[in-house]
């Protein structure tokens, strides 16, 4: 089953094909930029196009964005989400034949990290770095949702392992550099002033595109809860 709507390329009004497997995703944006809309759209699209995928959600701000996952056993705290993903990685490295996509979505991971003491901070930065460095080979994928994607929050240069990066709204020059590096210098100036639900996406091997995000069809997203009841 396919979702008809995808991100719209504002440069040529073509539909973009967003990678739904073998992807580590970093999604950034200020409050009110459309970051949540983009996140939920990608979740809905991925769930419907990858029915065998196993999704887990952690929201440090404990908001209502992931209400569709309540009572499914797939909405957990940030620490447990990272620990469980690391356990899944270790199991697959040891030969457990699970090869379905395992996707862990960490909303406001930086706030979680900054709330830890020094020892725990290093431990969980290291765990996330391991997932980012090794996970894709074992069908384990990390999505990090944040307002500010500072490199200091990701150990050992692991931020570079995000092969799909999205910035919603009109990001600051600092955020643009953090997300896109030197590639941002090639972006037209009018791509940097965006309305709610508009932004930039970088995909490995493709580069940067100017995008708009469709509004969420909650009926499609709520399919997640029904799928979990069946399985």
Feature map (PLM): residue ranges:
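P-loop NTPase catalytic phosphate-binding loop
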Residues: 1-103, 110-171, 212, 219-231
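Phosphate-binding and hydrolysis-coupling loops of NTP-dependent motor/remodeling domains
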Residues: 1, 171-231
């Amino acid at each position: 089953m396919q979702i008809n709507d995808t991100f719209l390329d504002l440069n040529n009004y073509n539909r973009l094909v967003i990678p739904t497997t073998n992807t580590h995703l970093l999604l950034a944006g200020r409050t009110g930029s459309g970051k949540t809309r983009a996140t939920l759209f990608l979740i809905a699209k991925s769930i419907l196009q990858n029915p065998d995928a196993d999704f887990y959600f952690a929201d440090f701000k404990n908001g209502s964005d992931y209400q569709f996952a309540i009572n499914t056993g797939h909405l957990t705290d940030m620490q447990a989400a990272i620990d469980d993903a690391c356990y899944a990685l270790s199991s697959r490295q040891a030969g457990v034949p699970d090869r379905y996509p395992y996707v862990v979505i960490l909303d406001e991971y930086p706030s979680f990290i900054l709330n830890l003491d020094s020892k725990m901070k290093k431990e969980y930065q290291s765990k996330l770095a391991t997932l980012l460095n090794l996970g894709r080979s074992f069908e384990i994928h990390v999505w990090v949702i944040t307002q500010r994607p500072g490199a200091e929050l990701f150990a050992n240069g692991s931020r570079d392992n995000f092969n799909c990066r999205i910035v919603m709204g009109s990001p600051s020059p600092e955020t643009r550099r953090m997300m896109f590096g030197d590639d941002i210098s090639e972006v037209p100036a009018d791509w940097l002033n965006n309305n709610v639900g508009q932004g930039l996406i970088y995909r490995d091997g493709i580069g940067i595109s100017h995008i708009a995000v469709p509004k969420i069809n909650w009926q499609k997203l709520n399919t997640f809860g029904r799928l979990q009841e069946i399985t």
